[in-house]
Amino acid sequence: MKTWQKIVVGGAGLMLASSILVACGSKDSKSSSSDPKTIKLWVPTGAKKSYQSIVHKFEKDSNYKVKMIESEDPKAQEKIKKDPSTAADVFSLPHDQLGQLVDSGVIQEIPQKYSKEINKNETQQAATGAMYKGKTYAFPFGIESQVLYYNKSKLSADDVTSYETITSKATFGAKFKQVNAYATAPLFYSVGDTLFGKNGEDAKGTNWGNDAGVSVLKWIASQKGNAGFVNLDDNNVMSKFGDGSVASFESGPWDYEAAQKAVGKNNLGVAVYPTININGQEVQQKAFLGVKLYAVNQAPSKGNTKRIAASYKLASYLTSAESQENQFKTKGRNIIPSNKTVQNSDTVKNHELAQAVIQMGSSSDYTVVMPKLNQMSTFWTESAAILSDTYNGKIKESDYLAKLKQFDKDLAAAK
């Protein structure tokens, strides 16, 4: 990693700079290389065209130019940390990278003006996704959660409210032989267990090693003998859904169009997760909630408060109600908005997928904001191994508790 000088500008200075940003814009148009008038922006892959109008509006209002580049969100942290001083001023990222970027000093708490707007305009879960250790570090512009897809010719809307009804009347498919922890691990939330504590930020706060956790493993193991359960793999989800072998499965918005093609637009139903019976208790199945963010990297500005203030202003434009509505309507984007006003618009209310995701993301009854800690890398591999081995019969039932207690210890010791 190249050495760079860390310059952090406080909120008061930024607000002063922001207030004179437009007025001073024309005077600074002949600025030197130490006071550049161009902001580098990284947007998600395939999103550049959809942001052109809002970026043009920002340029007109601020007298700053924006150099917009498409970049892969999952690699945001890696690319920014490589050399923050030459990276983007404003960049998109998934919220689970937030903690590592804050801990490494790459991004700072956003000015209070914007954090107040976020808390007022965005859903509570989305605002939580933009926070770390009680402070707001980024701007939400969308939410993402898995939902239940089902074939309406095989199951009714009432049927899919209960996992037991689904599997008694038809079939449910999931990847249990090779578990996807993102999809399956939230079952532990359903029985009251926590991952990295109640707020997801306590590295030693995982408590799967208890009777509730054991009941989850017993349930997973029991699905091998459930006639209504079909094990899937990465390559056959849509083919099984299309040929009728599977009447329902859980996935995210990214599979919506493929699911429509598999069973036909008129046959595809979308719903929130069902309730599920674990150890004789009817509980709500839960999912991870992902939040899409824009963050500001102050390093390229080299202490130029006007440019930093302009960068925060650009992030605010990109995540505004107007921009979120456009991101939802644009074909190929279809980002589910986190802004409460946009969520209540007729366009969003009349969209079945959007309504299911919004209900999933409406409260902790359905979703838990995915933790942002470094230790998540250990979590993914170790939890997937335990869950897969349980389904495949590689762990004795008598060893479930010990395995889970060791898992808790391993996560607590991870860095």
Residue ranges and their predicted role:
Residues 3-13, 17-97, 277, 375, ...:
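Conserved N-terminal structural module of periplasmic/extracytoplasmic solute-binding proteins
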Residues 70-79, 96, 230-243, 254:
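Short helix-initiation/N-cap motifs at beta->coil->alpha
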Residues 95-147, 158, 270-271:
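Hinge/lid segment of periplasmic solute-binding proteins
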Residues 103-109, 133-135, 259-283, 351-352:
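Ligand-binding "clamshell"
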Residues 131, 337-340, 354-410:
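C-terminal capping/gating helix-and-loop segments adjacent to ligand/active sites or protein-protein/ligand interfaces
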Residues 137-141, 146, 164-214, 246:
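Extracytoplasmic/periplasmic solute-binding protein
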Residues 202-233:
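Glycine-centered hinge/linker elements that transmit conformational signals in sensory
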Residues 262-333:
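Extracytoplasmic/periplasmic substrate-recognition and gating elements
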